[in-house]
Design a protein with these regions (language model features):
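C-terminal catalytic domain of photolyase/cryptochrome flavoproteins
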Residues: 1-190
């Protein structure tokens, strides 16, 4: 929130974190800070970003509009453990790790084929750190229609993502307690 309210500048954050050293975590943090600034630049120069595809050729994409699928995604009841954990964490805490944000966004847009606006609007309503510029640019990135988008055919496989980033199942089980007794080898295989 300190960046959001201008209590500290991105330059100050960059410099202070650079003084820590040059490890992978600092470099990753700098990339995220740069993405934040890039997103703000985009929104300033393209104020329609929250409502229109940056890449206009996606305006004709045949998005679905299944309200039941959207409700399942929003409530964390898709049957896909890592997706359900992320969506329940979002609802319960107002937070979600960036990797899980990408997984649930990819699932909404690439697996359920629901318009990225639905996800953007839900994140805006639920995230404690909601930011219009980041939210809009990130959703378009995942959906494949943004300025620096992931290719439309890039899909985050929620099964392998769960196995890779929650290999012990600790995160998933924390938010999907009905899977507490599920053996690890079956946890991410819906």
């Amino acid at each position: 929130p300190h960046l959001h309210w201008g209590e500290i500048s991105p330059h100050q954050v960059w410099h202070a974190s650079a003084c820590i050293g040059k490890d992978d975590d600092v470099e990753h943090f700098h990339r995220e800070l740069a993405w934040r600034e890039f997103s703000h630049h985009l929104l300033y120069h393209f104020p329609e970003l929250p409502r229109r595809n940056f890449n206009r050729k996606f305006d004709r994409f045949p998005w679905g509009d299944d309200k039941d699928l959207l409700a399942c995604w929003q409530s964390g009841k898709t049957g896909i453990p890592i997706v359900d954990a992320g969506m329940r964490e979002l609802w319960q805490t107002g937070y979600m790790h960036n990797r899980v944000r990408m997984i649930v966004a990819s699932f909404l847009t690439k697996n359920l084929l629901l318009h990225w606006h639905h996800g953007q609007d839900w994140f805006w309503d639920c995230l404690a750190d909601a930011n219009l510029a980041n939210n809009s640019a990130s959703w378009q990135w995942v959906a494949g229609c943004g300025v620096d988008a992931a290719p439309y055919f890039r899909i985050f496989n929620p099964v392998t993502q769960g196995q890779k980033f929650d290999s012990t199942g600790e995160y998933t089980r924390a938010f999907v307690p009905e899977l507490d007794r599920m053996p690890d080898r079956f946890l991410f295989n819906p």
